[in-house]
């Protein structure tokens, strides 16, 4: 599981850099400033959680069950939160109205919060 967690974190990190560069260069010409800021929020949260997954993968004092819970919460959260933000920010560039799926953004955010909460609780339960 450790290799999977760290690999996913690295993939999310690489994609965040690519998407950030794409937003700063290609999308800057076609998106409104407001939509560009929205897109950048998705990139930023993806990168935060890429680093978080790498941290989780490298921690040796977290049991595998806890790591697995955190992994799936963060994986799902990033895909729903950042993914929906990317689609919503670029909505004007496609014929499909992605605002119809806007409700998944807060679900993704909630999953990210749960991932951090599981991490926090596992740390608080540890005996020094």
Regions found by a protein language model. Name each.
Residues 1-128:
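Polytopic transmembrane helical bundles with strong interfacial aromatic enrichment
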């Amino acid at each position: 599981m450790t290799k999977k967690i760290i690999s996913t974190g690295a993939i999310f990190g690489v994609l965040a850099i690519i998407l950030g560069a794409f937003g700063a260069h290609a999308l800057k010409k076609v998106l409104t400033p407001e939509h560009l800021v929205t897109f950048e929020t998705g990139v930023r949260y993806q990168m935060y959680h890429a680093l978080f997954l790498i941290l989780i993968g490298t921690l040796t004092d977290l049991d595998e069950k806890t790591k697995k819970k955190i992994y799936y919460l963060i994986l799902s959260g990033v895909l729903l939160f950042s993914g929906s933000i990317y689609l919503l920010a670029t909505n004007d560039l496609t014929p499909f109205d992605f605002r119809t799926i806007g409700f998944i953004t807060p679900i993704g955010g909630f999953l990210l919060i749960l991932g951090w909460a599981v991490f926090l609780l596992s740390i608080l339960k540890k005996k020094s």
